[in-house]
């Protein structure tokens, strides 16, 4: 059973509906006990990084998520802001994240953008690396919906599983062990998002 973590931010209904349409059993909960019993987790998110982390702390979810991922090796998929929260730190609010992936979240460097390249970045393009299970059987060219002003910056290039370009190349998907983060919204990306979520539900992560 996949548990979508409810902390008051994110497209919970859209994600749940996409999972249900894909034949995947899921539940939505912000109850720490339910999260402890989940076999897989999805961390959604839309909004401000600092507010999101403050909310997770207030609801007693930070330690629960960290323990399930680090100690029980439960797979987690972070989506959009949720994908950013799995990192160590964000320039948005200058605050620490969950620290599950060795990466930081940085603002787009406007000095490297042309007048036509606006912030927030809105688009549909993503280029997966070869042989990435999360993108198995996804029709190419893949189209995933973005709207964001900050992006991932990975320490280890091997953690990057997909990339996009907006003035310059940036990581749009990352994986570190049993933790995956995507900057885009699979729940808003039609058949491409459906296949990605099916893949996450079926992937073998190992111990």
Region spans (language model):
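N-terminal beta1-alpha1 ligand-phosphate binding loop
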Residues: 2-24, 187
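An anion/phosphate-binding loop that grips the pyrophosphate of nucleotide cofactors and donors
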Residues: 38
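Cysteine-nucleophile active-site neighborhood
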Residues: 47-122
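Pocket-forming structural segment of enzyme catalytic cores
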Residues: 88-166
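Short, surface-exposed beta-strand/loop micro-motifs that present aromatic residues
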Residues: 168-175
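Acyltransferase
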Residues: 182-207
């Amino acid at each position: 059973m996949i548990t979508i973590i409810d902390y008051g931010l994110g497209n919970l209904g859209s994600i749940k509906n996409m999972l249900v349409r894909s034949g995947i059993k899921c539940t939505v909960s912000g109850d720490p006990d339910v999260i402890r019993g989940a076999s897989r987790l999805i961390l959604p998110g839309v909004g401000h990084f600092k507010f999101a982390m403050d909310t997770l702390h207030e609801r007693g979810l930070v330690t629960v998520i960290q323990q399930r991922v680090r100690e029980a090796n439960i797979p987690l998929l972070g989506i959009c802001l949720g994908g950013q929260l799995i990192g160590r730190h964000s320039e948005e609010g200058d605050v620490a994240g969950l620290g599950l992936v060795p990466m930081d979240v940085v603002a787009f460097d406007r000095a490297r953008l042309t007048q036509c390249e606006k912030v927030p970045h809105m688009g549909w393009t993503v280029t997966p690396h070869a042989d990435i299970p999360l993108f198995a059987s996804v029709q190419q060219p893949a189209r995933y919906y973005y709207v964001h002003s900050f992006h991932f910056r990975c320490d280890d290039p091997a953690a990057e599983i997909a990339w996009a370009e907006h003035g310059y190349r940036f990581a749009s998907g990352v994986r570190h062990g049993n933790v995956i983060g995507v900057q885009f919204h699979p729940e808003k990306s039609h058949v491409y998002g459906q296949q990605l979520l099916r893949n996450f539900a079926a992937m073998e992560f190992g111990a």
